[in-house]
């Protein structure tokens, strides 16, 4: 299984009190879902540019795998977004998260946009579990 975080997932895990966040990460590790994967484009939605305010996000991301977005992933994301019928209302970042997920074995996406992610993967043959952040 692979855990993939969008900006809502990163914010949810980074925003918890330190002890609670550590317990949650240990449980994810025990279930072989850690380290989580985060597409690099997601970082634009979680960073403020203020190193003090970004402290908890930086701490969390040091424990994650940050993945680059290549041309093929971007094309796959665009296709998912178009096929959803909601390309005008679904963020490109969410489409990239969805495209990454459908390429993984047993993916789980932790997101604050479960409806958008569900629409993106609805017509795809891959099974993607979506969890609300």
Positions of PLM-derived features:
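General small-molecule cofactor/ligand-binding pocket signal
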Residues: 37, 67, 110, 129-131
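A generic structural signal for short hydrophobic patches within well-formed alpha-helices
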Residues: 10-11, 43-46, 74, 117
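Short, well-structured N-terminal submotif of metal-dependent ribonuclease cores
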Residues: 1-38, 47-65, 125
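Amphipathic alpha-helical interface surfaces
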Residues: 19, 42, 53-57, 73-76, ...
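Short, function-defining helix-loop hinge/capping sites that tune catalysis or transport
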Residues: 14-16, 102, 121
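Short, charged, intrinsically disordered terminal tails
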Residues: 56, 86, 119, 123-133
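Short, histidine-centered active-site or binding-site loop motifs used for metal coordination
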Residues: 8-9, 41-42, 81
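Active-site neighborhoods of divalent-metal-dependent phosphate/nucleic-acid chemistry enzymes
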Residues: 66-114, 118-119
């Amino acid at each position: 299984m692979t855990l993939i975080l969008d900006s809502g997932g990163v914010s949810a895990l980074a925003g918890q009190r330190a002890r609670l966040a550590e317990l949650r990460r240990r449980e994810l590790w025990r279930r072989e879902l850690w380290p989580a994967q985060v597409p690099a484009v997601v970082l634009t939605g979680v960073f403020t540019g203020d190193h003090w305010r970004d402290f908890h996000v930086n701490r969390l991301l040091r424990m994650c795998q940050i993945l680059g977005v290549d041309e093929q992933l971007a094309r796959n994301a665009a296709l998912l977004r178009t096929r959803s019928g909601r390309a005008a209302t679904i963020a490109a970042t969410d489409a990239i998260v969805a495209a990454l997920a459908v390429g993984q074995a047993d993916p789980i996406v932790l997101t604050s946009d479960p409806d958008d992610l569900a629409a993106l993967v609805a017509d795809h043959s891959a099974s993607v579990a979506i969890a609300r952040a």
